[in-house]
A protein has these predicted regions:
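Small-residue-rich segments of transmembrane alpha-helices in multi-pass membrane proteins
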Residues: 117-120, 124-125, 188-203, 271-276, ...
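Junctions where cytoplasmic loops transition into the N-terminal start of transmembrane alpha-helices
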Residues: 188-192, 249-282
Length: 298
């Protein structure tokens, strides 16, 4: 339990101090943001800071810090170190820079920013790569929730039914102004994601039924199939440490920020929140089951 508490504390301290340091180095100021100067009522729409944070959290998280962290837990408590240090020094910086660079470049996407600095060839490469990446992520973030919803609803509402519902929702959310659907629904889902993590953490901390193993007693690879920590643990836990996919999402909220001063809370803060969620689920993975073999079989 002490390891878990120290890791959560480290993430919070990292947000407060290292996140502020990153913000200071970047030099956020009081200049007008694209949400103000390019306000079109569609993509560039000023939104409240707390809404932007929750939308950003849901955009970058989804099921990633749950599935990824649980798979990462197969390696044992050593996964905690990757989540903590990856979030503070890699993921948080990556997401912050992507969001702030977009804000400084009139809300440009990651591919357009790449083209600005690396030329037209890399612009086209990043456009193709981004489309492929988004299709792959879209498939995962469609099939996963559809399967879960099918388990929670009557048998006639199978995974195929929910998959179509999700796809239709995607199209609606994409074609209407960002504050009409995404800005209204995503904050609710973001709160649900946080509440779920708090609930699981509460069980871990206050239930005597589960024992959280300490890192110092389990500082070795516990994967039941002897899969190497390097590089597999680091690519297994992406959402929850660092994920390049986030670069495609941060510009969406960069177009809604009303001040560059929101960058620390929205971009770095959402990544730290995702790291905390990943920590909770990784701890659940190593605690709820007798060993990593039982977790794998589950």
């Amino acid at each position: 339990m002490l390891t878990f508490i120290l890791c959560i504390a480290a993430l919070v301290v990292g947000y407060i101090f290292y996140g502020k340091r990153v913000d200071k180095i970047f030099g956020s100021d009081d200049r007008e943001t694209p949400a103000i100067t390019l306000n079109d009522g569609v993509d560039f729409v000023p939104m409240k800071g707390w809404k932007i944070f929750l939308v950003q959290l849901l955009n970058i998280a989804g099921l990633g810090p749950i599935f990824g962290a649980l798979n990462g837990a197969l390696f044992g408590p050593v996964v905690y170190l990757w989540i903590v240090f990856g979030t503070i020094f890699a993921g948080g910086v990556h997401d912050y820079m992507c969001g702030m660079l977009s804000m400084r470049h009139k809300g440009a996407s990651i591919s357009e920013i790449t083209g600005t600095y690396l030329g037209k060839v890399m612009l086209q490469v990043m456009r193709v790569f981004s489309v492929i990446l988004l299709v792959m992520v879209g498939v995962v973030f469609s099939k996963g929730p559809a399967g879960l919803l099918a388990l929670l609803t009557p048998e006639k509402l199978d995974a195929t039914f929910w998959l179509w519902v999700i796809i239709i929702y995607y199209f609606i959310a994409t074609f209407v102004p960002i504050d009409k659907v995404i800005g209204k629904i995503y904050p609710i889902f973001g709160i649900c994601l946080i509440i779920m993590a708090v609930g699981v953490a509460g069980v871990l901390l206050f239930s005597h039924e589960y024992q959280m193993p300490e890192l110092w007693n389990n500082f070795y690879n516990q994967h039941p199939q002897n899969i190497h920590i390097w590089p597999f643990m680091f690519v297994t836990v992406a959402c929850g440490a660092i994920s390049g996919f986030h670069a495609t999402q941060s510009p969406m909220m960069a177009r809604c920020c009303t001040s560059e001063k929101q960058g620390h809370k929205v971009f770095y803060g959402a990544m730290v929140a995702e790291g905390i969620i990943a920590m909770v689920w990784a701890a659940a993975g190593v605690s709820f089951y007798e060993n990593t073999q039982a977790l794998l079989e589950a």
